[in-house]
């Protein structure tokens, strides 16, 4: 998918793009070899958006894209989150703005036996939170969080504008 823009869902529920499903139970069900390049995902300025991309696929590259205004009240929100994926995943040269975790791997039940999100590269990205969100009701958490992942390389990223909110961490 190249050069496509996506707006928030009605009421900001769910994810704008779902690559795979959290209900898939075998590797044969996992979609694979997907590339998102120069994609724009924008949450609703007033209502927010729970998640930009649910990444439950294999051999995925997200590059040169802009995911912004991802935020929610009372629950986590993520620009990119993956949990039911074997990998590999490359997240490169993106603008990622979310109130919750900008990037999250793990944190939800994995339905494929013996699968751990693996072989993940996160490089040359700009992870941020809008400073205007400080002191509001948006649920603020970490810029990058790995709850369940292995063989992860994080390099040459800029991570800024994080403060203690629903979680004290970076």
Feature annotation, model-predicted:
Residues 43, 47, 51-54, 69-71, ...:
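Alpha-solenoid helical-repeat scaffolds
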Residues 15-20, 53-54, 79-81, 169-170:
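Aromatic-rich beta-strand patches that line glycan-recognition/binding surfaces
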Residues 2-8, 28-43, 58-71, 86-105, ...:
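Right-handed parallel beta-helix
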Residues 25, 52-55, 60-61, 79-82:
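Long, hydrophobic, well-ordered secondary-structure blocks that form the structural core
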Residues 76-77, 105-108:
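Leucine-rich repeat
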Residues 81, 143-145:
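Short catalytic-loop micro-motif centered on adjacent basic/acidic residues
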Residues 13, 49, 76, 99, ...:
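Beta-rich catalytic cores
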């Amino acid at each position: 998918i190249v050069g496509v823009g996506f707006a928030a869902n009605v009421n900001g529920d769910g994810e704008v793009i779902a690559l795979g499903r959290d209900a898939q139970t075998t590797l044969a069900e996992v979609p694979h070899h997907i590339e998102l390049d120069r994609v724009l995902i924008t949450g609703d300025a007033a209502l927010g958006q729970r998640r930009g991309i649910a990444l439950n696929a294999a051999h995925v590259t997200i590059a040169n894209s802009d995911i912004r205004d991802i935020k929610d009240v009372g629950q986590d929100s993520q620009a990119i989150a993956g949990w039911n994926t074997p990998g590999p995943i490359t997240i490169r040269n993106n603008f990622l703005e979310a109130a919750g975790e900008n990037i999250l791997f793990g944190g939800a039940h994995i339905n494929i036996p013996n699968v751990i999100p693996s072989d993940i590269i996160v490089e040359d990205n700009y992870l941020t939170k809008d400073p205007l969100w400080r002191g509001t009701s948006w649920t603020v958490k970490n810029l990058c969080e790995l709850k369940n992942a292995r063989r992860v390389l994080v390099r040459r990223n800029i991570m800024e504008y994080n403060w203690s909110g629903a979680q004290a961490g970076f």
